[in-house]
């Protein structure tokens, strides 16, 4: 097997794009051997069935008389020897049956080959998509943050499948090559000189479409880049549909979308026209040269009627074959930018991969999370998100981090979860630096509840159980009860089996947040971070969430960190941290800070 693998690597060295699939293990030795075997069998049955027509035509021409007036062809001698070996007589009936069997076997092998190539193509497309998805999710936050939504969706969905299409195009091209070799072999045995003329003509036709292959490559690069910007546009507009409707901007947005659609239409038409040139040029040229070759062979090489018939049959088959060959070369060129895009994502994300298991396990209890003289600046930003911030978050208490938008609140919690690393200073769990602990052990002790709830198109039970797949139904129900979510869940038609629509659109914002809170409680994390989680909920839901947090803090020794700029959200807080423009303004107990001259006091007065 190792020798076979080395041979495959050597052969694929001439096809760097194809070698990529093998190098990254999207394509195995068995896949290649299976595909090649099926295509080889298709070719063998095709060639032999065509060659069988020669002795059959010779028999028909002589009206079944085996004592031909003209010396039999080479093919007659081959088939006569073969039939005699099995004790069969070479006649019209046996040859006709042989042709029927060979055609059936050829079609059977072709069917198996098509199914195999399509299966392989979709499997590789799936594996490419999953490798990209895994790589992006496992990369550091800086890499993920720079990956736009449109590029993410386009890479996972469109580009992965398009890249896999190159694999099928290469396989089809290889099959065509085998078919051409088979046809020309039959022709060479029948009439060597005439066959050389046909081969030369075929080579010239293949070279003539080279410029269209380059055009297809350039157009495909434009399509890849355009799809990303188009997907970004659509995703951005869909996320902000409320703002569009309220501002009565529907017509303007539709007009803008039409400009994108028009550009995509123009690119698609250009690709279609470029591909259509194969039909416009290759087929007529091939027909003219085929007729010329046929004329030369009949006049100058004195071929028999049976040999002329086989030449006509092969030349007629070569016309669509040569056209298909040109199409597949264009397809490879069209898929190449997608393959490069996908492989670059896989390589780049791998180079930015977080190592989750390096370091000690954070298992000990600690009195506080200490932020010491931390400074952080986002890449490509001129401003410091945090500047020399020193503060402390006591464990088993409720801490609120407040401040204006852009004050650094979310950046601070990202530092606690080790999603980012400070440029200066350090984060400590107790007296030990976060750098000593593995990222996995730190994040296992943290649950994050965002302003936009992550709700799946699944049942209530499955949505809550997501963080702990092994959790029992009773544990899920207890978590929902703690999150004050059990009342509304029991009022749903199917209770815990009720299917929540994508993003939870069939329940209210407050109910979605309580589902998220139940999920956080089920995870049994020590630290729960709520990033403006009550910002878009009604007063009643906010009060329910506040009660749930009070309950979980009191009875379960949880550290609650609340990011907010709404004063109602931070009732019954034990500790308060105030940020402004990336700097620490104050920290301490709320009842003490409300007398200081700071942003918190001004907000309370308002």
Model region roles, listed by residue range:
Residues 242-249, 273, 318-345:
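Cytosolic ends of transmembrane helices, especially the final helix of ABC transmembrane type-1 domains
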Residues 522-526:
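A short, proline-enriched helix->beta-strand linker immediately N-terminal to the Walker B motif
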């Amino acid at each position: 097997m190792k020798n076979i693998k080395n041979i495959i690597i050597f052969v694929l060295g001439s096809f760097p794009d194809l070698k990529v699939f093998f190098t990254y293990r999207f394509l195995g030795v068995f896949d290649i051997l299976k595909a090649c075997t099926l295509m080889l069998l298709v070719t063998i049955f095709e060639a032999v069935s065509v060659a069988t027509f020669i002795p059959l035509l010779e028999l028909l021409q002589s009206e079944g008389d085996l004592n031909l007036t003209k010396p039999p062809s080479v093919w007659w001698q081959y088939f006569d020897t073969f039939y005699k070996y099995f004790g069969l007589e070479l006649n019209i009936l046996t040859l006709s049956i042989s042709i029927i069997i060979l055609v059936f076997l050829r079609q059977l092998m072709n069917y198996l080959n098509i199914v195999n190539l399509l299966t392989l193509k979709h499997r590789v497309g799936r594996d490419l998509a999953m490798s990209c998805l895994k790589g992006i999710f496992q990369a550091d936050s800086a890499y993920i943050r720079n990956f736009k939504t449109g590029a993410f969706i386009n890479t996972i969905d469109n580009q992965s499948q398009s890249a896999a299409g190159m694999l099928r195009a290469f396989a089809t091209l290889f099959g065509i090559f085998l078919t051409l070799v088979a046809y020309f072999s039959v022709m060479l045995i029948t009439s060597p000189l005439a066959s050389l003329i046909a081969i030369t003509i075929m080579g010239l036709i293949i070279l003539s479409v080279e410029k269209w292959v380059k055009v297809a490559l350039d157009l495909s690069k434009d399509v890849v880049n355009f799809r990303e910007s188009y997907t970004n546009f659509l995703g951005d507009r869909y996320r902000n549909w409320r703002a569009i409707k309220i501002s009565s901007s529907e017509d303007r947005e539709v007009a803008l979308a039409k400009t994108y659609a028009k550009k995509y239409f123009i690119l698609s038409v250009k690709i279609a026209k470029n591909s259509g040139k194969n039909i416009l040029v290759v087929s007529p040229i091939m027909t003219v040269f085929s007729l010329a070759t046929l004329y030369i062979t009949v006049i100058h090489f004195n071929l028999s009627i049976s040999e002329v018939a086989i030449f006509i049959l092969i030349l007629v088959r070569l016309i669509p074959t040569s056209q298909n060959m040109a199409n597949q070369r264009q397809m490879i060129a069209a898929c190449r930018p997608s393959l490069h895009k996908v492989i670059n994502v896989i390589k780049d994300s791998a180079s930015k991969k977080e190592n989750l298991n390096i370091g000690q396990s954070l298992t000990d209890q600690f009195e506080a999370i200490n932020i010491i003289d931390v400074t952080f600046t986002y890449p490509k930003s001129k401003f410091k998100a945090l500047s020399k911030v020193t503060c402390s978050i006591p464990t088993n208490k409720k801490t609120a981090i407040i401040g204006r938008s852009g004050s650094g609140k979310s950046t601070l919690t990202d530092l606690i979860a080790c999603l980012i690393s400070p440029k200066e200073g350090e984060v400590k769990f107790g007296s030990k630096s976060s750098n000593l602990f593995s990222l996995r052990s730190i994040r296992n002790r943290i649950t994050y509840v965002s302003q936009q709830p992550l709700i799946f198109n699944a049942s209530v039970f499955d949505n809550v159980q997501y963080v702990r797949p092994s959790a029992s139904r009773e544990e899920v129900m207890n978590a929902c009860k703690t999150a004050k979510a059990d009342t509304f869940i029991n009022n749903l038609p199917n209770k815990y089996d009720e299917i929540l629509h994508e993003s939870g659109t069939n329940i209210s914002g407050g109910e979605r947040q309580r589902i998220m809170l139940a999920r956080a409680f089920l995870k049994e994390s020590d630290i729960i971070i709520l990033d403006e989680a009550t910002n878009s909920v009604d007063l009643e839901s906010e009060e329910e969430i506040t009660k749930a947090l009070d309950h979980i803090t009191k009875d379960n020794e949880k550290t609650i960190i609340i990011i907010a700029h709404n004063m109602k959200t931070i009732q019954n807080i034990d500790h308060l941290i105030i940020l402004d423009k990336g700097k620490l303004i104050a920290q301490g107990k709320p009842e003490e800070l409300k007398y200081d001259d700071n942003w918190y006091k001004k907000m309370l007065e308002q």
